[in-house]
Amino acid sequence: SSASGASDVLGALGVNLDLEPADVARVFHEVGLTFVFAAKFHPGFRHAATARKEIGIPTVFNILGPLCNPVRPEASAVGVSNLTRVPQVAGVFRTRGATALVYRGDDGIDKMTTTGQSHVWEVTQGTIREHTVNSEDLGLAKARPEDILGEGPEHNADLARSVLDGDAGPVRDIVVLNAAAGLVSFALANDPTEVERGLMDRLAEKIALAQSTLDSGLAQAKLEQWVAATQS
């Protein structure tokens, strides 16, 4: 977690983000994932890009981005840094009839955190359920804020590579926790009865899945496939 955004880090990892919408769709069909760059799909956003970087703090664009996803995915996992905005974002997903996990760490980051508790709003079938998640209850060691603080794109790309290489530690822990949130949302969209099971049990299962995907090398292989597809 840092001032360096996802697009910056993906670029440092070799993912070509300067793709037209048709190629973004092609990459998705070839690889199974893709990156929807706001500057390409919402050209108006680019006029605020420089100011956002200069300000260096979250703005309304951090909230608008996930809500303006042109794909309109049936399942979403979205972090919001402003606590008062979290229920509002959850309400948008409810109005759309979508499934989502919307969350904020008590340390103020727009992620599920490993430094303490996270507040989670689970949206499914027009209802919103609120949860509190302590990562230690999921078997993840408590981290210090400085343990998960990133820097520039190259530094964060190196951290990503170390996680993909199987290195253990606080960075891997927060990665698998947030990956689990996305997997829980996806499972819930496919089977709404999943909501009847405890969120902690579902998160624990998906953390195990994320860990095995890293340890097996499948995540590393998928990144390499993704990079190649965006460069072709």
Where does each model-flagged region fall?
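Glycine-rich anion-binding loops and their surrounding alpha/beta cores
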Residues: G11-D18, D23-S232
